[in-house]
Amino acid sequence: FSFAGKQLAFDDPRSALFFEYLNILNHIKSVNPNVKFMLENVKMKKEYLDVISNLLGVQPVFINSALVSAQNRQRYYWANWEFCQPEDKEVMLIDCLEDDVDEKFLHTQKALEYMDRAVKGGRNHWDFKHHSDARSDKSQCITANTFKGVPYNVVIAFKENLRAKSKCVRSGGRGSFDRHEWDSADKIHVRKFTPTECERLQTVPDNYTNHVSNTQRYKMLGNGWTCDVIACIFEQMPIEK
């Protein structure tokens, strides 16, 4: 369904899992009509959104994780109880960045050249804003591809303590971050998000995923939920006594 993907919708095997979810839910309802359910999915075309909503019998609530974290992560949430948007916690990207990062997370010159190369219409990965920077409000949306490095995992970090957030956008314009400025800028580091920073962007406790390789941590976090959003939804679930 994702606008960032191939948009195969229900023809994608992963999206077709929705019908497995629906079959399981309907089976449980036949035993327990009062069962509570919740479903999350990406931003999608209205025609697909309507199919899911009609089959579930409820309308979704659209929530951006940016309200509770430093990440722009726009998702639809369906549940068979009423719930409101979470309050804005005003978390900045700088709040999630680690101070001392191992050099292995720094991008190589080869990686930066990959970001510079023309992709479509003479534009490059910088122009498409496949990166986050500490002077913006929020980070881009982390995905399962974050482990690949460029162009999915590029953050411009600063030695000085700037308080700001980064953004998740896909439109053009380098603005003040034209990379030619950075080459002589001592204070600027072009690197990957660390797994711990990704945990913070998903409001997961530090080192919660450190029992597996970094590659698996990135995939796990990119495919996961923003914990504080889910907590907000579940906190509003009515408890029958």
Model-found features: residue ranges?
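Acidic-aromatic/histidine active-site loop/patch
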Residues: 230
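Short pre-catalytic strand/loop immediately N-terminal to key active-site residues, enriched for Gly-Thr
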Residues: 213-219
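Class I S-adenosyl-L-methionine
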Residues: 1-183, 189-191
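Generic structural marker for isolated residues within well-ordered, non-membrane alpha-helices
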Residues: 49, 198, 214
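Short, hydrophobic alpha-helical segments
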Residues: 234-241
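FAD-binding beta-loop-beta segment adjacent to the flavin cofactor pocket
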Residues: 188-211
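A helicase ATPase "motif cassette" and its flanking acidic/Ser/Thr-rich regulatory loops
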Residues: 226
